[in-house]
């Protein structure tokens, strides 16, 4: 069966792929079909030198691109072959994440807060995963794409953790956000990396400190741009989050001056098929990190990823 002619170029995750590179993808997908999708993606990442600033291959992003090209009929991929037990990775729980004595008061009493970047297979990383798995209603999931995690501590409480956060790549499509920005499909494909999604935010259940959540969000808005640039080589322009409106009202985001944009349409986070999948509708909030953010997102060029040394990417 003949495959349709490839486009002149495709832009994905901030990188433009020429027709010759797309031809290479088609050729490798045909030649190594017996290896499976993951190995095809890894091979292409090596050939195209598609890497993170830390040097790690962008395997997930490459596989996602291949699957989108396959959906358009531009190349063929082997069927997915499940390996081992399916489902989320299990996190072994220990006493480190067990309930602790209650902390009360106001956020001002716990200043200065410390937002500690969690990287690699450190003790902080294991603690972060445990706390999220045990105490967050969504539990722990391996994030995809770019990500940054924080543990929040206070000088007053020493090593005791007050909160955990995770920031990840933005949702591919979000009607309320995309209308607010006013960008085209091509502009979104080019500039989406400049948006960072707050995919996990956990105030630990024994921490009952008034105003703490909004205070942490304000600290993040100041610190995250530099931390993200240090790891990925560019500064984000906009923060976003999705709040389960059946559980939460988004009060802390409102208190931290995030902008409410409405609700999602009940589609999955990486919606590719323009249809509802049964996902609960979420409240959409955004927080600009610069002036004229909508215009800047519409006009931005794909980010230039730094070759500087960065923390090991754990995702």
Where are these regions (language model features)?
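Short, cationic low-complexity segments
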Residues: 303-315
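Short, Lys/Arg-rich nucleic-acid/phosphate-binding segment
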Residues: 80-83, 265-266
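Basic, amphipathic alpha-helix used for nucleic-acid engagement in HTH/winged-helix/SANT-Myb modules
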Residues: 1-22
